[in-house]
């Protein structure tokens, strides 16, 4: 069989797969008679409301000299680590705004960072295709730098995100531009499992984000530039357990819902979506129309402790607070006093749900605290 014939057969098979996928999508839409917001309205659910003092900027963390790309909170809620284009990781005391560590990175092109569950170590990765681990208790060297305690090498593309397995300082999952996710044993520095990639059923484009279920740490979800999100079981690396369709652009961010049965996605297409991992159904779309025709991309997202609120960062500097039940925007932090002056690149909620931190291309991080008549939701 000639190369031309093989290409023709491949194109025909691809078209068949796409046709079947579209039929499956239409069938699911027929069976799904309502979405979450429709059901909530039918049950008489009232919308969440915010007053002018219910979520306010209480801290501005200044110290980076380049765009902030990533942030993460410690489980004990009072420290934040941030990664910036300036080639540094900074660990902040969220209560005082003071810097406790400033780590100069071996590679300045960092894209992601994460705190270990114990808060004793931080991880980061970027265009060097390596995930570097720093022990915050290690002494600095003669040049005043923190030494790398472990380098996790094995990816063939940039490291786009990393997250420690809950309650474990010894295992971590990374996603990469090489279309794979990897579970690492930090103690040995070796790959425990590789998810996707050549000869495996996985993503067909760069993987941008991962989120591990807190209720079942064996499960994690990944989002990719192939417009899909996939559910994985760490015990079965050869294939994804589920594949979720619906987006029309790169999936930039994924986040598990607090109960572990659902997860959210955010995309270049300007939408966030809520999926159920048990039924594979899309439960809700969160989209705010823009009159000027320019659709801002979703960059980051986080759920409140109860899941009733969804915080979403956008490329135009908006940061919407969504009512997840009614699919309504209840507040835009991009339009209030002390809002960021650039793209919202990352955000995260403290462990107790009492504060939100946002990071931006304006080089700053801001901490937003619940106050007024609004308690933690």
UniProtKB/Swiss-Prot annotation:
GO term, biological process aspect, one: G protein-coupled receptor signaling pathway
MF terms (GO), sorted A to Z: signaling receptor complex adaptor activity
Protein keywords: Repeat, Transducer, WD repeat
Family matches, as InterPro entries: G-protein_beta_WD-40_rep, Gprotein_B, Guanine_nucleotide-bd_bsu, WD40/YVTN_repeat-like_dom_sf, WD40_repeat_CS, WD40_repeat_dom_sf, WD40_rpt
Annotated WD repeat ranges: 63-93, 105-135, 154-185, 202-233, 246-276, 293-323, 339-369
One GO cellular component term noted in the UniProt record for this chain: cytoplasm
Family that this chain belongs to: Belongs to the WD repeat G protein beta family.
Role noted for this protein: Guanine nucleotide-binding proteins (G proteins) are involved as a modulator or transducer in various transmembrane signaling systems. The beta and gamma chains are required for the GTPase activity, for replacement of GDP by GTP, and for G protein-effector interaction.
Record protein name field: Guanine nucleotide-binding protein subunit beta-1
Organism: Nicotiana tabacum (Common tobacco)
Lineage: Eukaryota, Viridiplantae, Streptophyta, Embryophyta, Tracheophyta
């Amino acid at each position: 069989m000639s190369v031309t014939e093989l290409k023709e057969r491949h194109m025909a098979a691809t078209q068949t797969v796409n046709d079947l996928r579209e039929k499956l999508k239409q069938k699911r839409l027929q069976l799904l008679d309502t979405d979450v917001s429709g059901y909530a309205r039918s049950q008489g659910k009232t919308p969440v409301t915010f007053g002018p003092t219910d979520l306010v900027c209480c801290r501005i963390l200044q110290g980076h000299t380049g765009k902030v790309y990533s942030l993460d909170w410690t489980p004990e809620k009072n420290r934040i680590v941030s990664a910036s284009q300036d080639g540094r990781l900074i660990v902040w005391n969220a209560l005082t705004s003071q810097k406790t560590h400033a780590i100069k990175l071996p590679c300045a092109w960092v894209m992601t960072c994460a705190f270990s569950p114990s808060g004793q170590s931080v991880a980061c990765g970027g265009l060097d295709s390596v995930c570097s681990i720093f022990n915050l208790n290690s002494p600095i060297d003669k040049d005043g730098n923190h030494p790398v305690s472990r380098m996790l090498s094995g990816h063939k593309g940039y490291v786009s995100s990393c997250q420690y397995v809950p309650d474990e300082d010894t295992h971590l999952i990374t996603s990469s531009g090489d279309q794979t996710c990897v579970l690492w044993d930090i103690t040995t520095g070796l790959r425990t499992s590789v998810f996707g990639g050549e000869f495996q059923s996985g993503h067909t484009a760069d993987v941008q984000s991962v989120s591990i279920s807190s209720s079942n740490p064996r499960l994690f979800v990944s989002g990719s530039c192939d417009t899909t999100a996939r559910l994985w079981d760490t015990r079965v690396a050869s294939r994804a357990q589920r594949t979720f369709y619906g987006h029309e652009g790169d999936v930039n961010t994924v986040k598990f819902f607090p109960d572990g049965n659902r997860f959210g996605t955010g995309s270049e297409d300007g939408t966030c979506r809520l999926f159920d991992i048990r039924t594979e159904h899309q439960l809700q779309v969160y989209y705010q129309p823009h009159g000027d025709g320019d659709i801002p991309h979703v960059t980051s997202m986080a759920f409140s402790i109860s899941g009733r609120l969804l915080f979403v960062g956008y490329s135009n500097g908006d940061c919407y607070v969504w009512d997840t039940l009614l699919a309504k925007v209840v507040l835009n932090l991009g339009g209030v006093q002390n809002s960021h002056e650039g793209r919202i690149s990352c955000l995260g909620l403290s462990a107790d749900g009492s504060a939100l931190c946002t990071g931006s291309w304006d080089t700053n991080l801001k901490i937003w605290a619940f106050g007024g008549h609004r308690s933690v939701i």
